């Protein structure tokens, strides 16, 4: 029985990590691509923050994306603040952390912008603000943006990046799905263009509502596009999903996305679509 109680020390005898040396390695020196697994020096990332091997787009803050996407921009509705209708424990602290991390008042930047010289109403969701979750005021900002675009007869471009509905706001969060989609339907009824760009991750209630309503739907390479999480599905069907089941390429293959666009090509592609797809007869 002593044999089974013997401690395995092979790794301790043959692989000894130098803890002091590890402490000398600067934080953030290396990056690992979550899609292909490539490890590379972080300095290889440019403003687009894409993997040098597979073109996976690392997550960006709304302001990082705004910096290379638009020549001009004007933020709208920046005074709208998140609400706490359920007085959820620690929610205010999460909101404060999200504000500090992103410089935004909510999980979405909204405003007027010029992309390749084309004027548009623009919304960019920020995955670093409570995972880009859809809260009551997130929905309010999106709805006001779309309604203003309808009134001014402007196209709308929305970049989605979200973990879904914000659980800390309960039913108030879920109501935003219908609210935003209704605004989109009125926008479309006015003969105006609505473009969506799906980025990593686009999931949950956002996928089930305004992310799926685009006249034209683009997606970034290898972005996660899903409704329920992988573990939830696997535990329900008692089967393991294919590795790429919730990737943009698979969603494209099944007809729910029109095209996958590399980040370096997004500005040019959107400018072309806005120029020719967003033209309106006076």
Curated annotation (Swiss-Prot):
PROSITE patterns found in the cross-reference section: COA_CT_NTER (PS50980)
Annotated EC: 2.1.3.15
Coiled-coil residue spans: none
GO cellular component: acetyl-CoA carboxylase complex
TM helices/strands, residue ranges: none
Family: Belongs to the AccD/PCCB family.
UniProt-recorded name of the protein: Acetyl-coenzyme A carboxylase carboxyl transferase subunit beta
Organism: Lactobacillus delbrueckii subsp. bulgaricus (strain ATCC BAA-365 / Lb-18)
